UniProtKB/Swiss-Prot annotation:
This is Cell division protein SepF. Belongs to the SepF family. The gene is sepF. One of its GO terms (biological process) is division septum assembly. Homodimer. Interacts with FtsZ. InterPro entries: Cell_div_SepF (IPR023052), Cell_div_SepF/SepF-rel (IPR007561), SepF-like_sf (IPR038594). Keywords: Cell cycle, Cell division, Cytoplasm, Septation. The keyword Nucleotidyltransferase does not apply. Cell division protein that is part of the divisome complex and is recruited early to the Z-ring. Probably stimulates Z-ring formation, perhaps through the cross-linking of FtsZ protofilaments. Its function overlaps with FtsA.
C-alpha cells in the first residue's frame, strides 16, 4: 500500500501522528539597547537659603542691595549708620525695587529692614516676634 493510503486510514480511525505545526515567524525588529541611568533624588534635601546682612553707609550702595534682591536673595538692611534723610531715600528706593520684583519689605526694628524677593515668604509681624524674643515691650 502506498503511504498516502495508510495515512488516510490512520487519520480516519484517529490514530494518525500529529503533524508538527510550523510557526510563522514574522520579521522581528532588532532590539536596540537603551542606556538608562537611574535617577536618584534625595527627597529630604531642601535648598539652603542664605540671608545677607548689609550695612550701607551711602545711598549709592543701594544698587548692591537691589542686585542681591534681583538674584532672589533676601537681604537684611541695617541703616543705623546712615543719615536719616539718606536712610529714608534708601527705604523708598528698596520699597520700589521690592514692588517691581514682586517682593516685599518689612521693618524689623528702628532702621533695620528685611527686603525679600518673591520666592521668600514672610509671615507674621517681625517686630512682634523680635520683641517677644527679647522682651522689648
Amino acid at each position: 500500500m502506498s503511504s498516502k493510503m495508510i495515512d488516510k486510514l490512520m487519520s480516519f480511525f484517529g490514530i494518525d501522528e500529529p503533524e508538527e505545526e510550523k510557526e510563522e515567524v514574522d520579521s522581528l525588529q532588532p532590539v536596540i539597547p537603551y542606556d538608562r541611568k537611574p535617577k536618584i533624588v534625595n527627597i529630604h534635601t531642601q535648598p539652603q537659603v542664605k540671608v545677607l546682612i548689609l550695612k550701607p553707609e551711602k545711598f549709592e550702595q543701594v544698587m548692591n542691595i537691589c542686585n542681591e534682591l534681583k538674584n532672589k536673595k533676601p537681604v537684611i538692611v541695617d541703616l543705623q549708620k546712615m543719615d536719616k534723610n539718606e536712610a529714608q531715600r534708601v527705604v523708598d528706593f528698596l520699597s520700589g525695587a521690592a514692588y517691581a520684583l514682586n517682593g516685599e519689605i518689612k521693618k524689623i526694628s528702628g532702621y533695620i529692614f528685611l527686603v525679600a524677593p518673591e520666592n521668600f515668604d514672610i509671615t507674621g509681624d517681625i517686630k512682634d516676634e523680635v520683641n517677644s524674643l527679647y522682651n522689648l515691650n
